[in-house]
Amino acid sequence: MPRSSDQTRPVILQAAYKLFRRRGFFRVGMDEIATAAGVTKKTLYYHFDSKDALLTAVLASQHERAFAEFQTYGIDLSGGAEQLIDKLFAGLATWSAKPRWAGSGFTRLAIELADLSGHPARSMAREHKTLMERQLATLLAEAQVPSPAERARELFLLVEGAMVMILVHGDRNYCTAAAAAAKKLVVGVPAA
């Protein structure tokens, strides 16, 4: 039985996401995405008029999921900034332990498209990172951390750096080191 248009779009997005994440944007073709989604190429182009449009839609979908999850980090801040930092880096350690983890797809994509500054996916990646940093600043403000926007930028650098080092070395202990540095930076807690 054929799927409805409402059911087809999410299937295409998920298939494209998996392929882009696993192999990168340039190494995946529309034929392969159509096959993975179980649709014809005509159906794929009915929903997305180009590979660039599909990639932008994939990123928008992933942003919604990641941002919604990240917003839950601030539900209970009774432990203050230290608890927030623990949760942030424990989340990164858990995420990086998943099979086939390859870091932030947004970061990887920005690198892959580095020479295409006007590409809509680069704009989407920039918007995602900006909104995540702002949300972190909001959480730090709620935890009564002074200069929350400045601290959020510094923490975000630690998170991104930890992701890169985990990818390079395959060692999740970089999360522990980044968390210790974050605590020194934000709450003045000496490393354990």
Task: Identify the residue ranges that each predicted region occupies.
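Basic, helix-initiating cap at the start of DNA-binding domains
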Residues: M1-R23, R27-A36, D52-T56
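Amphipathic, non-transmembrane alpha-helical scaffold segments
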Residues: S5, L13, L59, H63, ...
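Short hydrophobic/aromatic patch on the recognition helix
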Residues: A37-F48
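Hydrophobic/aromatic residues within well-ordered alpha-helical segments
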Residues: K51, Q62-A66, L77, A81, ...
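Alpha-helical DNA-contacting segments of helix-turn-helix folds
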Residues: L55-Q62, E69
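Hydrophobic alpha-helical connector segments
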Residues: A57, Q71-P99, A152-L155
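Amphipathic alpha-helical segments used for helix-helix packing
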Residues: A97-H119
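Hydrophobic/aromatic-rich alpha-helical bundle segments in the mid-to-C-terminal region
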Residues: G118-E127, A141-A192
